[in-house]
Regions:
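Elongated alpha-helical scaffolds that mediate protein-protein interactions in large eukaryotic proteins
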Residues: 1-187
Length: 187
């Protein structure tokens, strides 16, 4: 309950600090990434969001600049991260985790690109960008410019979603590009 949530939060922060710039720690933590994104039943809204954001910070530090670790991430982990994108509110931070997974050190990993594209597009888990079309995007931009935090958060999410798709399209993963051509008006 409350004590358990505080303990989990402290553990996630400790592991994040441990993984920062330590390849050996990143290597040891990589197999456990999936467990940090599994939804805990019965968590309060704000608490679940905080835990998911702390897990995303940990994942970023585990993956950051470590191609070997990124190559070993399995599709199940990618799907867990993708399914956590909309817990309570859209999360641009968790999209950054997927970007790092696709292109660590700016060099794409084709298998990860395909896993990410599939996870984001198969059930339209992340495609809020296309819900209401152009009018919705214009409304979000205007609301964000006026200081509406919720609109700014959704707009940030949309921008990160496009960056994530860009990370998935760069490189030599033709299958990911084909899927993206079906989702985005590229031509």
């Amino acid at each position: 309950t409350a004590a358990r949530r505080r303990l989990r939060s402290a553990c996630l922060r400790f592991l994040t600090a441990l993984a920062t710039s330590h390849p050996a720690a990143q290597d040891k933590l990589q197999p456990t990434l999936h467990s940090f994104f599994v939804d805990e039943k019965g968590e309060a809204t704000a608490t679940a969001q905080l835990a998911a954001d702390e897990a995303a910070h940990l994942a970023l530090e585990v993956l950051r600049g470590n191609r070997g670790v990124c190559r070993r991430v399995v599709e199940e982990t990618v799907r867990a991260i993708a399914s956590s994108l909309h817990r309570e509110r859209p999360s641009a931070l968790r999209l950054r985790v997927l970007q790092e997974l696709c292109c660590p050190q700016g060099r794409p990993i084709a298998a990860n690109q395909l896993h990410v594209v599939r996870a984001l597009t198969e059930r339209h888990v992340a495609l809020v960008l296309f819900e209401d079309g152009r009018a919705e995007r214009a409304r979000l931009r205007a609301a964000a410019a006026a200081g509406d935090a919720a609109a700014a958060s959704r707009l940030d999410y949309h921008q990160e979603l496009l960056r994530t798709f860009l990370c998935c399209a760069c490189g030599r993963c033709a299958e990911a590009e084909v899927v993206l051509r079906g989702v985005l008006p590229i031509d």
